[in-house]
Amino acid sequence: MLYYLFEWLHKLNFPGAGMFGYTSFRALMAIILALLISSIWGDKFINLLKRKQITETQRDAKIDPFGVNKVGVPSMGGVIIIVAILIPCLLLGKLHNIYMILMLITTVWLGSLGFADDYIKIFKKDKEGLHGKFKIIGQVGLGLIVGLTLYLSPDVVIRENIEVQKSENEIEVIHGTHDLKSTQTTIPFFKSNNLDYADLVGFMGEHAQTAGWILFVIITIFVVTAVSNGANLNDGMDGMAAGNSAIIGLTLGILAYVSSHIEFAGYLNIMYIPGSEELVIFICAFIGALIGFLWYNAYPAQVFMGDTGSLTIGGIIAVFAIIIHKELLIPILCGIFLVENLSVLLQRFYYKAGKRKGIKQRLFKRAPIHDHFRTSMSLVEPGCSVKFTKPDQLFHESKITVRFWIVTIVLAAITIITLKIR
C-alpha cells in the first residue's frame, strides 16, 4: 500500500519518495518492520495468550516424556509470525505482483489450517487436533492452486539460460531475449543446471509439454505437503523450527535475488525470472518475523508456534522454492526436514513390520530423529528392542537445536555451491 502511495508522490517529485522504487530499500524496511512487530507486539500477544489460558495442554508422560515440562507455555504463537509477515508485505510490496499474491495466499491458507488444528487441540481438548485427512486436503488444495496459477498465469515467465562456448576454455552464460512459459526447474549437474519436466514425459510426443505441466502440478502438491509436514515435525524443541526456517529462508532469499537479476543469474548459470524481485520483500519479512519470534521461542521457550506457525512456515518455504524453480534443491536445502519426515515413516514401518511378527521393535529410541538424541533406553517401552541405540550420551535440547542449525547452515552453503559445479 505504501509502495503505491510513494510511487504517486514520486510522480509529484516529492523528496525521498523514489526510495520505494528500490527493492533493496523495501527489503530492508520489511525485515526491520517484521522484526519489530514480532518482538514488540509479540510480547503483548504472549501475555494475552497467558491471560486467556491458551497454553500447551497436558500430555501423557508415557507417550511424550518431555512434554510434561512444557505444560502451561502459551501456544498458537504462529499468529505472531503470520502477522509479522503480512503487515510488511501489505505495506511495502507490489500487491499486483503474481508472486507476492501467491505467497500471501499461502501464508493465510496454511495459517488458517494450522489455526484450526490448534483451536481443536486447545479449546476442544482433542489432542489429535484437526483430522489428518483434512490437513492433507488443505495442503493438496494449496498445491493445486499454486501449480495451476503458475501454469495458467501469463505473468509467470522465465528467460532461459544458455551456455555459449566463447573459446576452448571459456563458457559464457547468456539469457534469451523473450519471456517464456516453461516447465524447467533448476537442478545441479544437468546441462545449464536445468531440467525440463516435459523431457521426462517425452514419450507423450506432441502432448509432452502439457504432460510436463501436469507433472509439475503433481510435484508442486507433493512438495507443499512434504515440506509443511517436515517443518511441523521439526517443531519439537525450543527454537528448532524457527531457527532452521530462518536459515532456509535466507538461502531462498539469496536465490530469489540472483534469479531476479539477469547478471547474477548468468553468474550462477540459472534462469532469469522477471518480477521475482518482489519475493525478496516477502522473504525478508519472513526472516524478520522468525528472528523476532525466536527471541521468545529460544530455550526455555516463552511461547510455542503450534501448528499455526509450523505448517505455515513449511508451506511458505515449499511454495517459495517452487515459484523460483528451485524445488528440486529442497532435498539438500531442507535436508533436516527430509530426515525428520523419513525418521517418522521408517519408525512406523519398522514397528508395524515387527508387530506382524509378534515382536516389539523400534528403529530409533524415539522419532522424529531429534528426540532420539535426548532419549534414554529407560524411556523406551518395556520389552521393545531398538535397532539404533547410539549415542549412549544424552544431549540437552538446546545443544541438539544448535547442532541442527549448524547442519542446516552447511546444507544451505552446499545448495548454493552446487549451482557452480559444471
From Swiss-Prot:
Membrane topology label: Multi-pass membrane protein
InterPro entries linked to this entry: Glycosyl_transferase_4, PNAcMuramoyl-5peptid_Trfase, PNAcMuramoyl-5peptid_Trfase_CS
Example of a GO cellular component annotation carried by this entry: plasma membrane
Any one GO biological process: peptidoglycan biosynthetic process
Pathway: Cell wall biogenesis; peptidoglycan biosynthesis
Reaction equation(s) it catalyzes: UDP-N-acetyl-alpha-D-muramoyl-L-alanyl-gamma-D-glutamyl-meso-2,6-diaminopimeloyl-D-alanyl-D-alanine + di-trans,octa-cis-undecaprenyl phosphate = di-trans,octa-cis-undecaprenyl diphospho-N-acetyl-alpha-D-muramoyl-L-alanyl-D-glutamyl-meso-2,6-diaminopimeloyl-D-alanyl-D-alanine + UMP
Protein keywords: Cell cycle, Cell division, Cell inner membrane, Cell membrane, Cell shape, Cell wall biogenesis/degradation, Magnesium, Membrane, Metal-binding, Peptidoglycan synthesis, Transferase, Transmembrane, Transmembrane helix
GO molecular function: metal ion binding; phospho-N-acetylmuramoyl-pentapeptide-transferase activity; UDP-N-acetylmuramoyl-L-alanyl-D-glutamyl-meso-2,6-diaminopimelyl-D-alanyl-D-alanine:undecaprenyl-phosphate transferase activity
Superkingdom assignment: Bacteria
Cofactor requirements of the protein: Mg(2+)
Localization: Cell inner membrane
EC number(s) recorded for this UniProt protein: 2.7.8.13
Spans traversing the lipid bilayer: 28-48, 71-91, 95-115, 136-156, 211-231, 246-266, 279-299, 313-333, 399-419
Cited CDD domains: GT_MraY (cd06852)
Family designation: Belongs to the glycosyltransferase 4 family. MraY subfamily.
HAMAP family: MraY
Function, as annotated: Catalyzes the initial step of the lipid cycle reactions in the biosynthesis of the cell wall peptidoglycan: transfers peptidoglycan precursor phospho-MurNAc-pentapeptide from UDP-MurNAc-pentapeptide onto the lipid carrier undecaprenyl phosphate, yielding undecaprenyl-pyrophosphoryl-MurNAc-pentapeptide, known as lipid I.
The name this protein goes by in its record: Phospho-N-acetylmuramoyl-pentapeptide-transferase
Organism, scientific name: Bacteroides fragilis (strain ATCC 25285 / DSM 2151 / CCUG 4856 / JCM 11019 / LMG 10263 / NCTC 9343 / Onslow / VPI 2553 / EN-2)
Taxonomic lineage: Bacteria, Pseudomonadati, Bacteroidota, Bacteroidia, Bacteroidales
